[in-house]
Amino acid sequence: MKKAILGKKLGMTQIFNENGKVIPVTVIEAGPCTVIQKKTVEKDGYEAIQVAFGDIREKLRNKPIKGHFAKAGVSVKRHIKEFKLEDSNSLEIGQEIKADVFEAGERVDISGVSKGKGFQGTIRRWNAHRGPMSHGSKFHRAVGSMGASSDPSRTFKNKRMPGHMGNVNTTVLNLEVVRIIPEKNLILIKGGVPGPNKGLVQIRNTVKA
């Protein structure tokens, strides 16, 4: 990938474009992310950078993590992530990656952990059809057939069943960057992105450009 950054989802709002049209946007506090380690082909077998984001009290980190940050000369952060960037050699340890690495009009992919919905049935979890809601029917929101009796006389693997919904890594592709506010490290993305407010998100240039 060419560029990437970690950020915190702040919430949604709406703005007006130059034609007066209302655009729903998600506000993301993107960075600053500090480079704390560089991976090289000679030492690690591949090239990448390790970045840290988000303040945290030092006493909440264990000694190995504190030592890792001390070696880089950087204050302890909450999140650590590794990116394989094309120009990782141009970045130095201690350098900050900020929101202005992206520009308005660019397309990005955003990853995050989706909101947890708890235990849900097949109608909400998989968009299954309901049964008849009247005329004497006793089948309304049940699962339905899970496998015939004599053949195959079992339930196949990966059958769509009730269960835990949400709280999984989710990526939304090809979202538009509407506006950058560099002095506040804010990126405004058209539409919604995965996760709750204050959730961690990863922004990178899109793979489908």
Curated annotation (Swiss-Prot):
InterPro entries: Ribosomal_uL3 (IPR000597), Ribosomal_uL3_bac/org-type (IPR019927), Ribosomal_uL3_CS (IPR019926), Transl_B-barrel_sf (IPR009000). GO terms for biological process: translation. PROSITE patterns: RIBOSOMAL_L3 (PS00474). One of its GO terms (molecular function) is structural constituent of ribosome. It comes from the Bacteria. Pfam families: Ribosomal_L3. Keywords: Ribonucleoprotein, Ribosomal protein, RNA-binding, rRNA-binding. GO terms for cellular component: cytosolic large ribosomal subunit. Residues 141-163 are annotated as: Disordered. One of the primary rRNA binding proteins, it binds directly near the 3'-end of the 23S rRNA, where it nucleates assembly of the 50S subunit. Belongs to the universal ribosomal protein uL3 family. NCBIfam families: L3_bact. Part of the 50S ribosomal subunit. Forms a cluster with proteins L14 and L19. This is Large ribosomal subunit protein uL3. It comes from Clostridium botulinum (strain Hall / ATCC 3502 / NCTC 13319 / Type A).
